């Protein structure tokens, strides 16, 4: 395992930094984010995700996000072969929560923007203004070929042109209830959506390529990026700096939210033993599928999310940043994340979501300087 860099010493700079946002990346697909026969094996269900998000809300997580995946990687673990649908799942979760922000993901090749605008307005009503939309262009070709809607490999180089038109239609419909947008990909003729959302609808994206960041800088409220490495919590800093620079070009403030997996235990050694156990059970067949799919896009550059996902360094959890250690060590590393300019929040996954969120809320979060404004909670959510 790659060891961490020496512990950083830093000072949290201002009040905003003292309130780094925390979100949970809910397991909408089977087995969460560990591609391993040694990891917990489970199917995605509404009841599981309901328990996760209600527990996250209890411990003052700020938001919950679900991805969309339409075809998995196979292998012994049938990784992500079993998935719920994002908008319908998050509509259900909106109805059983009261404070936490809720985000669904739109696979934009599958859903016309006017339909997404209306679905989002509906969940805004269900949630009382707590809903937002994550827009993805689509990178895994077989997801769309199986339905006969893959637009051809030229799409790889035009996908953010497509998404730019898509979000303009959304903004028209949410803002005024009407769109007459005319573009290369979409033509609206007095298209109507009513009722409109009760609050401005947040749009988020996860672009790491230059084109993706340029899109986020112009249209997104914030941008997700991958953490990097194992116990190297600030290694993503160059990515956050690129996003900050791109946003400065548009005169907007678009922060970075960073994806990490937390594997924690009483001691560093106990947590590391779990991590090594998961790696030893890596599902090589599923990982080979991921590597093969990552090579299909030859037009978007070398800095895309999927290229990082397929990197062999930590492929067992698709190369999201990984924080492995005692509760105190993980708290310290998350405070180091908060020290990075442009980092406004983190999106967390866990090897075991229910116990992971509980130990985070009771043992890790109370030790974090960047969450010191929150009360310490020990009572389990019902």
From Swiss-Prot:
**UniProt-listed InterPro entries:** Luciferase-like_dom, Luciferase-like_sf, Pyrimidine_monooxygenase_RutA, SsuD_RutA_monooxygenase
Q: Which CDD domains match?
A: Alkanesulfonate_monoxygenase
Claim: Translocase is one of the keywords in the record:
no
Please state what the protein is called: Pyrimidine monooxygenase RutA
Sorted keywords for this record are: Flavoprotein, FMN, Monooxygenase, NADP, Oxidoreductase
Species source reads: Escherichia coli O55:H7 (strain CB9615 / EPEC)
Query: Which SUPFAM superfamilies does this one have?
Result: Bacterial luciferase-like (SSF51679)
* Class of the enzyme per the UniProt entry, highest EC level: oxidoreductase
């Amino acid at each position: 395992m790659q060891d961490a860099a020496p512990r950083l010493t830093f000072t949290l700079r201002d009040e905003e930094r003292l309130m780094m946002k925390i979100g949970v990346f809910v397991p909408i697909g089977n087995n969460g984010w560990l591609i391993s026969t040694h990891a917990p094996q489970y199917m995605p269900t509404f009841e599981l995700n309901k328990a996760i998000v209600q527990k996250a809300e209890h411990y003052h997580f700020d938001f919950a996000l679900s991805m969309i995946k339409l075809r998995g990687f196979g292998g012994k673990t049938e990784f992500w072969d079993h998935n719920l649908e994002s908008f319908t799942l998050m509509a259900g979760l909106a109805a059983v929560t009261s404070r936490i922000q809720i985000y669904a993901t739109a696979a934009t090749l599958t859903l016309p923007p006017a339909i997404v605008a209306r679905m989002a307005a509906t969940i805004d009503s269900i949630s009382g203004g707590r809903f937002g939309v994550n827009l993805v262009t689509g990178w895994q070709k077989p997801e769309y070929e199986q339905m006969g809607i893959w637009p051809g490999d030229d799409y790889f180089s035009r996908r953010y042109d497509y998404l730019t038109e898509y979000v303009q239609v959304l903004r028209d419909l949410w803002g005024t209830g009407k769109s007459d947008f005319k573009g290369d990909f979409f033509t609206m003729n007095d298209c109507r959506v009513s009722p409109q959302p009760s609050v401005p609808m947040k749009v988020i994206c996860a672009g790491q390529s230059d084109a993706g960041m340029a899109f986020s800088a112009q249209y997104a409220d914030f941008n997700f990026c991958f953490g990097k490495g194992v116990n190297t919590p600030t290694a993503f800093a160059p990515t956050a700096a690129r996003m900050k620079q791109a946003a400065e070009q548009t005169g907007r403030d678009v922060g970075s939210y960073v994806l990490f997996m937390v594997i924690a235990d009483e001691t560093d050694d106990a947590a590391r033993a779990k991590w090594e156990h998961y790696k030893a059970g890596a599902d090589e067949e599923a990982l080979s599928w991921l590597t093969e799919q990552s090579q299909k896009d030859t037009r978007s550059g070398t800095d895309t999310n999927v290229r990082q996902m397929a990197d062999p360094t930590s492929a067992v959890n698709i190369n999201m940043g990984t924080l492995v250690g005692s509760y105190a060590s993980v708290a310290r590393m998350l405070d180091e994340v908060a020290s990075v300019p442009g980092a406004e929040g983190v999106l967390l996954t866990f090897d075991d979501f229910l116990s992971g969120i509980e130990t985070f809320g009771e043992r890790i979060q109370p030790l974090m300087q960047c969450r010191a404004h929150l009360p310490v909670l020990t009572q389990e959510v019902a």
